[in-house]
Amino acid sequence: MKLYDRTRKRSVRGIRTSGFSLLELLIVVFVVMVVAGIAIPNILSAVANVRLRASAGDLAGLMQDARILAAKNNTTYAIHYGTRNGANIAYVDLNGNGSFDTGEPVMQFSGSTVPASGTPSGSNGQPSAYVLVGDTGSSSYDNTNTLGYTGRGLPCNYDTTTTPATCNTPPAKYFVYYMSDTRVGGSGWAAVVVTKGGRAKIVTWNGSSWN
């Protein structure tokens, strides 16, 4: 009987020492919370960056589609912005009526990404304006201007203040179309740059410079 009791006591003691104490559990929970607090914002930022860059890529692709169609059909086409079913879009205005019609090339901005109202100011959380390396001009066309492509496939500033609208080449400046999103900790910025020769590229703001 005594032998049984001693064995049982040893067994009970073994069970107690093989588990976790409350302090150990609290430490584990604390470590998990710290890691999650660091990782989750980084993950959300990475997802936002992917969506922002995807929208910029889709817009650049749409611009190239407009360029190809303009050269193919020997017609000037402009790229306009609007909404469809509550989503922000950009489209190639094939019939020149200034509104989106079924069958026209279109792209939709993803997530919370929206076209900017114009060139960022460089203050209040906004980046500085993008400057194309090697360009000697003093500024660029931006979201306040309408990008068009002539029948030669060259970009132009589509001017609707004239009747009919004019789109002369070569353009006086290069084009930069900005977009931004809303994310944890602020906003992200990207842009599509179109050179005077019609070449398009994507740039993103990393918090201190465009690259």
Regions found by a protein language model. Give the residues of each.
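N-terminal helix-rich module
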Residues: 2-10, 23, 29, 34, ...
